[in-house]
Amino acid sequence: MIPRSTRQQAGREAEAFALQFLQQQGLRLIEQNWLCKRGELDLVMLDGDTVVFVEVRYRRHCGWGGAVESVDFRKQGKLVTAAQLFLQQVSCWADYPCRFDVIAIEGSPGSFDGSTVPLNWIKSAFDS
């Protein structure tokens, strides 16, 4: 088993890699690791006039299912609830259109450069 601190570090690196990728695609960061009593929003971005709630999922290997499959119905519900709370608390974004994206990253950590670790950006991965 991989120690928790190593897993957390790999997760932070994957999030930083995803953020850099999205910014290169023209999205702007609103919030990162926004916490509430119902969960966490990894990245809240702005794509044009759309608020994008991005769930970043990293899996070293897909022995128990891949990164995309880990965003199941239960996780989607938690993300929707957290997004609703975000829009209530940060009300300046409440009237903007919203969507939920998933960034799925699989492979060995430490080489998040896009050539050896594939990144899969799923726009509008699910509906609220």
From Swiss-Prot:
Gene3D superfamilies hit by this protein: 3.40.1350.10
Pfam family, one: UPF0102
Superkingdom to which the source organism belongs: Bacteria
Coiled coil: none
Listed GO MF terms: nucleic acid binding
Protein family according to the UniProt entry: Belongs to the UPF0102 family.
HAMAP family in alphabetical order: UPF0102
NCBIfam families: PRK12497.1-3, YraN family protein
Protein name: UPF0102 protein PSPTO_4420
Organism: Pseudomonas syringae pv. tomato (strain ATCC BAA-871 / DC3000)
